[in-house]
Structure formats: structure tokens, C-alpha cells
């Protein structure tokens, strides 16, 4: 069958469908450099801005594929949805194309949060619009992990067929395998080396973890700024208090507020506690309470390590997310991600999600003392046969992070089009 590839990126839909004998007759991608790579790989030069194309001139096709922009609905983005100035409007251009060309199949991809966005109203609206054009629609959240690809990457996959789906079944999950090692290269193309500052972060947390008594519980996340803090968090917030009352308390790392101005006090409160609200949400209260309880129990040895943590450059480096409960506290056998929410540690079974928003969050393989390499990212995303792609950090990681996973697309396509 003939298909079109909208918001094409590196061409994940193209790779998956063409490998099954389908023919791409049209593509669209707004970024110039990715259009160039698409042409080099597939000998089709994509159109640019979808809002400026002549919809009538799009060739007839049986399948419409689109990984339409996810930032408006993403938790990692700003979740503005249809209010997003540009990207939030892309769905309506898709509708125009569908209405004009009436393809037999629709195959779409987006972030899982699309389902929950605006309390489900956004997805309900979109689904009804597609159904109104005569399609039966189904959707499911799937991760490459479901098919033994070592990447945690939940995405929403949407399939639709004119009139009815005729017994379409989503592909079955496979028995999990801890197989990241099979995707690692002997001669990796490492685009970036870890900075000296991040090495200090790793060594600091390595030292901290080595001091934790055996069988001790480690809260996740651990917000070390709460060590020694006494500002209120259960039924009130610093913002809701009078200056004279705050001056009797302590801020991050036990800094006394005595004789401080309100501005000075807020400079010594963690960023997450500076919000202008009278009460914190339950989840934040829980995180703060757990960290303070941990400190109370472990104060004697923690205070000896604390100066090293305080010396770390950013607040994000002072927060630890240990996603390995039950494991030995051995940092050097784990995968490390430097995120805005903290230093995230996970088991070495699979890669965390490759994201487009930041090149700073590329997974670091502590036992290899390097970041996940360019060729390994390509293999995990199913692009290992791709000949041409961005060669630099600032271009490659956003492109691969935005791409659909080729193996997942292939699995669904096989069931949908067979």
C-alpha cells in the first residue's frame, strides 16, 4: 500500500513500513537538516512546514502516518495542549489532510499524557473528530520494553481504519529480557565525554552510598536540602508565614533564618518549596517527610558526608533518585541520568527514555565510564541500518529522541495491515 510520512523526522515510520513492502509517496518535515538526511536515506525530499503545504497536491495514499508534535501534551514539556501557539494546532492540519484524502488507515504516535491531558477532554475531543470522519479508532500505550528492546519509552499508539478495524489485535508482549548488553558496541561512537563537574557529582554520590549501613532504607527521591531543615511543610508553607515566625526556623541544610530578611530566607529554601501557595500537595509533603526522617535516623554519618553534597554546583545534583530498591548501593554498576529532577540511578537492564528536550540527559553507563553512544542510540531506536543522520551532539540527540521506535511501529503495522 501507499503511505505518507508526516512530521517525518529521521524516518521511523518509513523504515518500518517500507521493510514490509509498503511504498512512501510523500513526506513532510519542518526541520531543513532532517529533510536533507531523509532525502539521502530514502530518495524522497520532504515538504517543509505542514501549515503552508497545498493539501490538494498530496498524492493519494492508503495509510497516513504521523508522529505529530508531542510537546503540547508532554509532562516534560509545558502541557499546554491545543493552546500551544504552534505545535498544539498540528492535529487540526492532520484532520484537514484526512478529510481531503480519506486514507484507509491512520497510524499515529504521541506521548502517553495525551490520554490524561486536561482530564481526558483533549483525547476525547480528538477521538470524536476522527470518528466523525468515518473511522473506527483504537489506542494503546506501548514501550519498546514490551518487545525486548532495552528502552523504557512509553508512547501512545493510535490506529484507525475507515469504517471498522476488522478484529485488529495489538501485538502481544514478550517475556522481558535484561538485554541492554546486546545493544552495546565494542567500538562505540561516543560523541561526548563526561565533564569534570559531573565526575565530581558521581564520586560524591558514590561516597555517600558507600556509607549507608547495610539493609538501610533509602527514600526515593532523596532531597538532601531537607537535611537539617525545620521550615513547615505539612499544613503550611514558608510563603504563608510571617517573617518573625520564619526567623525562628532553619532552611536547606540546616541554615538558620535568624536575623535574615525574607529575601535572604527564600534564598535558603529549596526551589520546590518557594511556591506561592498556602499548602503543598500530598506527594511533596511525603517526599519532604521521608527525607527528613532518613536524616534524623542517619544524622551521625550523614553529617560527615554532607559538606561534599552542599558543595555540588546545582540543586538538581543534590537530589538523588535511587530507582534500584533492594539492590546493593553500588553506583558504578548502574545507569545514571542527570535530570532537572535530580541524579537518577537505575539498573543496567535497559536504557531510560531517549529524550529530545535536552542533550544533557543522555544516559551515562557508569560501569563503562561513558555515555550511551550514537550507534547504540540508533540501534535501541531501530535505526541501526540508517546511513545518514546528524553527526553532532546538539543535532543527533534531539533527532533520535523525537523519533518513533522502529521495532514498535513494525510490530503494530504487521498486525494492522496484514
Residue ranges, per PLM feature:
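Flexible, glycine-/basic-rich loop-and-beta segments that form/coincide
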Residues: 149-231
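Core alpha/beta nucleotide-donor-binding catalytic domains of modification enzymes
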Residues: 2-108, 112-124
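Conserved Class I S-adenosyl-L-methionine
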Residues: 121-137
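Residues that flank catalytic or metal-binding motifs in active/ligand-binding sites
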Residues: 138, 152-156, 350
Amino acid at each position: 500500500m501507499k503511505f505518507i510520512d508526516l512530521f517525518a523526522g529521521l524516518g521511523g515510520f518509513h523504515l518500518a513500513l517500507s521493510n514490509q513492502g509498503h511504498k512512501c509517496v510523500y513526506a513532510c518535515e519542518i526541520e531543513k537538516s532532517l529533510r536533507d538526511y531523509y532525502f539521502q536515506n530514502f530518495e524522497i525530499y520532504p515538504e517543509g512546514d505542514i501549515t503552508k503545504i497545498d493539501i490538494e497536491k498530496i498524492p493519494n495514499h492508503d495509510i497516513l502516518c504521523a508522529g505529530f508534535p508531542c510537546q503540547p501534551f508532554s509532562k516534560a514539556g509545558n502541557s499546554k495542549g491545543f493552546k500551544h501557539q504552534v505545535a498544539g494546532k498540528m492535529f487540526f492540519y492532520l484532520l484537514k489532510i484526512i478529510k481531503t484524502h480519506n486514507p484507509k488507515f491512520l497510524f499515529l504516535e504521541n506521548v502517553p499524557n495525551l490520554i490524561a491531558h486536561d482530564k481526558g477532554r483533549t483525547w476525547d475531543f480528538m477521538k470524536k473528530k476522527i470518528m466523525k470522519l468515518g473511522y473506527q479508532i483504537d489506542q494503546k500505550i506501548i514501550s519498546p520494553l514490551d518487545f525486548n528492546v532495552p528502552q523504557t519509552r512509553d508512547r501512545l499508539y493510535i490506529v484507525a481504519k475507515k469504517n471498522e478495524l476488522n478484529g485488529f489485535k495489538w501485538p502481544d508482549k514478550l517475556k522481558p529480557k535484561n538485554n541492554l548488553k546486546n545493544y552495546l558496541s565494542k567500538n562505540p561512537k561516543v560523541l561526548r565525554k563526561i565533564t569534570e563537574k559531573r565526575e565530581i557529582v558521581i564520586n560524591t554520590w558514590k561516597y555517600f552510598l558507600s556509607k549507608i549501613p547495610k539493609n538501610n532504607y533509602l527514600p526515593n527521591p532523596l532531597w538532601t536540602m531537607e537535611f537539617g531543615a525545620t521550615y513547615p511543610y505539612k499544613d503550611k508553607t514558608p510563603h504563608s508565614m510571617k517573617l518573625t515566625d520564619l526567623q525562628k526556623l532553619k532552611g536547606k541544610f540546616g541554615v538558620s533564618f535568624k536575623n535574615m530578611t525574607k529575601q535572604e530566607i527564600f534564598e535558603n529554601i529549596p526551589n520546590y518549596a518557594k511556591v506561592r501557595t498556602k499548602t503543598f500537595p500530598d506527594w511533596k509533603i511525603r517526599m519532604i517527610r521521608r527525607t527528613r526522617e532518613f536524616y534524623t535516623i542517619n544524622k551521625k554519618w550523614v553529617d560527615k558526608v554532607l559538606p561534599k553534597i552542599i558543595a555540588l554546583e546545582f540543586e538538581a545534583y543534590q537530589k538523588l533518585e535511587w530507582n534500584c530498591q533492594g539492590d546493593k548501593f553500588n553506583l558504578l554498576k548502574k545507569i545514571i541520568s542527570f535530570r532537572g529532577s535530580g541524579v537518577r540511578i537505575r539498573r543496567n537492564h535497559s536504557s531510560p527514555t531517549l529524550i529530545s528536550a535536552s542533550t544533557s540527559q543522555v544516559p551515562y553507563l557508569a560501569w563503562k565510564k561513558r555515555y550511551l553512544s550514537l550507534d547504540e542510540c540508533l540501534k535501541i531506536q531501530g535505526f541501526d541500518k540508517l546511513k545518514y543522520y546528524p553527526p553532532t551532539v546538539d543535532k543527533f540527540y534531539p533527532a533520535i529522541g523525537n523519533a518513533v521506535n522502529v521495532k514498535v511501529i513494525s510490530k503494530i503495522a504487521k498486525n494492522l495491515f496484514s
